[in-house]
């Protein structure tokens, strides 16, 4: 059912193509683009960081002062405008907050004023709408960085005719990061004092994600299974009671995959392309991966992994059993950076097995694409994974994902044994090293003993699609439900 075009303000702390640290940026680029293709007037707004790409394309359109509190100084900022694939992007420039080397942290140390920085961003995003005469029907917030916007719409702007028809939604990309800050950072926000009891994390601290969840008109998690997990104490990172309060307004919408960037038939990063009907190029990619990783060029199965080196990604589950697994006739290629301790352990293991394990303590797009194309299996033993994108890429590239059945991984990967006709990979449940090892050995056994079945599962994987237009239809319904709230 077609719906009338809406005015949508998409508020995010990062957008792929301009600035990115994680999966939020991918969604913040793709979702507005596909909404715009459906005829909606979508405008993205984000901070004008020092690290923004294509800065020279941004043009100054306004200079304004954000009112704060009687007796306290207003905050000056400038509004820049550019386009990203035809979608209007506003960049809020305030050097005291955003003229820094990184987005959120330096040397693994978060900026001490992140609460103040993103409180300003939230307030300025709404202020900028008025200055630009853009009255959105939907303000789409994302994660803790924008958690104050729903509260501001219901307090500061509750009787503002400009926002009379505006409703807010918030997408939860990762509830582990909640934006908890001392209340002194919100000196420009009198609303915080009035509502502190509801949105406080502990005495004297404000939880911005909690704020967004409590005051948004509708809430979505980035996969159906993750939405269910947020209602449990095990999956909600201390916020289960808050999500339970809003359960009627919470839904799960699976992220789409942007196949124009992730299609092995048209991937400029690859030494050879391929598709489901002709996998010759995949064999070339495998040989190139082995060469670039410094491994012998053989027919051994390759297990790939591309991730941030964090506990969330399950690296600590893999490390205790990596030695045992490398005693089999396999190769493993791990690409990623992050926790120095995890990196050191991986490096030490690679030195013990130079012909079997390659650890590349880095990240770049070309290498990520090569691992997806050249590996036979892709490891994602995550402790939690709200949606996950790499498993979608792996499926498209005929690289069978081996995942822990959590969050979006459970929604997107069909286990070899659980549903033989529709299998696309391998799943395991318990977050223990030995259970992971069992799953890896199971995948290896099937690879060696049943190549015909492996080829069929590979075809199933490559024919699986998670298209953004399907997700957009669900977002449109959520927007309509939000607008129906009184």
Swiss-Prot record:
ADP-alpha-D-glucose binds at residue 20. Its EC number is 2.4.1.21. It comes from the Bacteria. Keywords: Glycogen biosynthesis, Glycosyltransferase, Transferase. It is an enzyme of class 2 (transferase). One of its GO terms (biological process) is glycogen biosynthetic process. Pathway: Glycan biosynthesis; glycogen biosynthesis. The keyword Transferase applies. One of its GO terms (molecular function) is alpha-1,4-glucan glucosyltransferase (ADP-glucose donor) activity. Transmembrane segments: none annotated. Disulfide bonds: none annotated. The keyword Cytoplasm does not apply. It catalyses: [(1->4)-alpha-D-glucosyl](n) + ADP-alpha-D-glucose = [(1->4)-alpha-D-glucosyl](n+1) + ADP + H(+). InterPro entries: Glyco_trans_1, GS/SS, Starch_synth_cat_dom. GO terms for cellular component: cytosol. Synthesizes alpha-1,4-glucan chains using ADP-glucose. Belongs to the glycosyltransferase 1 family. Bacterial/plant glycogen synthase subfamily. This is Glycogen synthase. It comes from Aeromonas salmonicida (strain A449). The gene is glgA.
């Amino acid at each position: 059912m077609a719906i009338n075009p809406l005015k949508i303000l998409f508020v995010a702390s990062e957008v792929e193509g301009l600035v990115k640290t994680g999966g939020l940026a991918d969604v913040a680029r793709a979702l507005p683009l596909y909404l715009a293709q459906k005829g909606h007037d979508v405008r993205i707004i984000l901070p004008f960081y020092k690290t923004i790409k294509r800065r020279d394309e941004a043009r100054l359109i306004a200079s304004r002062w954000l009112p704060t509190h009687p007796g306290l100084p207003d905050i000056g900022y400038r509004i820049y405008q550019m386009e990203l694939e035809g979608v209007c992007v506003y960049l809020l420039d305030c050097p005291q907050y955003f003229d820094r080397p990184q987005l959120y942290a330096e040397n693994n140390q978060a900026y001490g004023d992140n609460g103040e920085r993103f409180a300003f961003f939230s307030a300025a995003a709404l202020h900028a709408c008025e200055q630009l005469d853009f009255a959105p029907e939907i303000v789409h917030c994302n994660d803790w960085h924008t958690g104050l916007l729903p509260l501001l719409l219901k307090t500061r702007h509750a009787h503002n005719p400009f926002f009379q028809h505006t409703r807010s939604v918030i997408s939860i990309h990762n509830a582990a990061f909640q934006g908890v800050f001392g209340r002194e950072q919100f000196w420009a926000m009198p609303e915080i004092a009035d509502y502190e009891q509801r949105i406080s994390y502990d005495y004297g601290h404000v939880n911005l994600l909690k704020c967004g969840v409590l005051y948004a008109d509708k809430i979505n998690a980035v996969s159906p299974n993750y939405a269910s997990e947020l209602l449990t104490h095990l999956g909600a990172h201390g916020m289960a009671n808050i999500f339970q309060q809003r359960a009627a307004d919470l839904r799960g919408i699976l992220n789409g995959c942007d196949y124009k960037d992730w299609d092995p038939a048209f991937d400029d990063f690859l030494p050879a392309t391929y598709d489901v009907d002709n996998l010759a190029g995949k064999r070339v990619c495998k040989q190139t991966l082995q060469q670039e990783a410094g491994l012998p060029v053989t027919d051994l199965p390759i297990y790939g992994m591309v991730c941030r080196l964090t506990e969330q990604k399950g690296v600590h589950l893999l490390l205790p059993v990596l030695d045992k697994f490398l005693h089999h006739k396999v190769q493993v290629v791990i690409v990623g950076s992050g926790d120095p301790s995890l990196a050191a352990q991986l490096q030490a293991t690679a030195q013990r097995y130079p012909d079997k394990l390659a650890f590349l303590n880095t990240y770049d797009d070309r290498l990520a694409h090569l691992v997806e194309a050249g590996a036979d299996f892709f490891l994602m033993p995550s402790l939690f994974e709200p949606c996950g994108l790499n498993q979608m890429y792996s499926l498209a590239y005929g690289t069978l994902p081996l995942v822990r059945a959590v969050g979006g991984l459970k929604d997107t990967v069909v286990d070899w044994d659980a549903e033989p006709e529709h299998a696309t990979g391998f799943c395991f449940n318990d977050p223990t090293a030995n259970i992971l090892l069992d799953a890896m050995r199971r995948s290896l056994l099937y690879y060696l003993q049943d190549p015909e079945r492996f080829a069929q599962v590979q075809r199933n994987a490559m024919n699986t699609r998670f298209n953004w237009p399907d997700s957009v239809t669900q977002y449109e319904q959520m927007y309509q439900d939000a607008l129906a709230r009184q």
